[in-house]
Amino acid sequence: EFGKNIHALASYYLRGENIDKMELSLSEHEAAVWNYLKGIKYFGYEVVNTEYNLSLKLGDAFFGGRLDALVKEDDTYYILDYKTGSAPKNAKFDYQTMIYLLAVSKFFKTDKVKFIYIDLKNKEELAVEYSPELGEEYQKRLVNAAAKINSDEIPPKKTECKCEYKAVCF
């Protein structure tokens, strides 16, 4: 619930909507996190979109997701991802990072893209910067992952899936 509230508040705020009543209803902890988030430099950049669905086709496979926010300063795009838990251990090669950076780079036809994990718990930021070389590596990894999923190489587990993608697990 906490994470959903912060995500919604950030989306409304970045779209320029009046959030006064929402801010008044925040708990002390939520207010502290919200004040940190709205004070980050990225919230002063040009807003491209919030809660932005994107997709990417590589070979026969489709990849997609929903960005928390996409902002821009000068000619650089910043993908913002608010984490109420922790950022991935290897953020550079996390599937979310790879898909989002590659999709935004291809859609906007630019190499000037950065993925910013915003760790709300520890009030830290972790940035991954896109490059053409990294994009090539991402494409290889994603195509290989899709091929493995579509082959018999990865048998479905018999245990209950608890990941955020459980709706599409086999």
Where are these regions (language model features)?
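RecB-family 4Fe-4S metal-dependent nuclease core
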Residues: 1-170
